[in-house]
Amino acid sequence: MLHKKTIEDLLDIKEIYMEPEVLSYQRAREILEKYAGAKLIEVPSHWKIPELHGFAGSVEDWISNKKNILVLGIKKSLQARPNTRSSHFVAPSESNGCTMSCSYCYVPRRKGYANPITIFVNIEQICNYLRRHAARQGVLPAEDHIDDKYWVYEIGENGDCSADAGICDNVRDLVNLFKNDISNAKLTFATKFVNRELLTYDPQLKTRIRFSLMPQKMSKLVDVRTTPISDRIDVMNDFVAAGYEVNVNFSPVIYYNGWLEDWELLIDELNEKLNEKTKQQLVAEIIFLTHNEQLHEVNMAWHPKAEEVLWRPEIQEIKYSETGGRNVRYKRGFKKDRVDELVELVYKRMPYCRIRYAF
């Protein structure tokens, strides 16, 4: 279930759903030229595509939808939402959805079922909004756990920017925006896909890329269509050399027999492969698994093997999300002990690595 190394192995666009207004945007015209052979299907809204969103029958075409379908839309609500963990703000998304199919992903919970990539073509409006928003913030008043100098904007909450960058220049435009036009802030995103084209972007330390990592054995089961873990680790030194700040996102942490021993192996690989420059700037984020009852039921139709480790009622409890969704997480006391174990392991085996947060 692990793909090859290029975006072409992930995407073979045969159909493009698009809002009619997108044709007035240069970014849309560039994408349509790139995928000139695709069938074009006009839709009133990128949110209202019945055969893709909220349609239970689409579970049978889960992977093919993500590989063969692209949606072009216009981001209408531009707002930067406050955050307190990986960033100070969550920026307006340049995309929504993903070509990868991680079985635990929260994005399909919000939009429904396969949720292939939607590219928002009004990137100039998004950039202009961010330019104004950052200007209003002034200088970061004090060093905090997020950054010691800059306001940080998350740009990839609803997708994987490394994959998006294989479709169009939205991500490049945002990297250039923060590098050239926004002096008091940087951007960040997490990724499970190695796109070496990003090494040409010259971010000048104004982009923090967070490589999502977990033990390879578990990744093979649940990280469907993503870059193998060792390949992600292999490029971390290259990204630091190319001017990125490189962090790691230990997420999601999944409990199973032998889980901590597998994390030791992953940490050993990091210690062996990372050079001193990468180690000295490394920060980790640790996030334990949260799952969802509806997504569990969908997964049972296309990837039931993963649910054997993701859906563990005997050690999980109900958690209601801010939007009212019925989610599950590890039981409070059980989870605290596991978090403490992993944090202790990281501090012991990776003394150079600060932990931004763990929960």
Q: Which role fits each region the language model picked out?
A:
Residues 155-163, 194-197, 207-226, 252-257, ...:
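Conserved radical SAM core fold
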